[in-house]
Amino acid sequence: MSPKSRYRMHSQLDNVNTARRGSVEEREPVWMNPADAQVRGLKNGDVVLVKCRRGACLCGLQVSDRIKPGVVSIQHGAWFEPENTPAGRIDVHGNANTIAIDVITSKIARGNVSSTGNVEVSLWKDEVPPVRIFNQPRRVNAVK
């Protein structure tokens, strides 16, 4: 499940401090029920891999009984930052679009479907890649 964030408008404002509330090592949080976390050997603050057949992303785990068992939640809006990792090319910042279903509701309506899908969440055991998406680009002087 991927709801909209109350701290940003889609991906706008992802680089402001309020959008980083609840983040873990500057990664978008994935919310999980305590029972599901326990079964997987996960704890609050872990960096986890969220994956499905469409893609994968790294998130910071937030454990909460406000999430129904069997469900995880990643809010929309984290900026996309793909990196080559031991698990393949994945988003390291927690962009929910990497795992969301990308189909239209019908040929007539062309609306979006609910941002849901089947994912698996596991502990990230490799070195945690740095989040660089907020860094300023390297300055390049114009050629005269």
Give the ranges of each region predicted by the language model.
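Long, contiguous, secondary-structure-rich segments that constitute the structural scaffold
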Residues: 11, 15-144
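C-terminal accessory/binding modules appended to enzymatic or scaffolding proteins
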Residues: 1-15
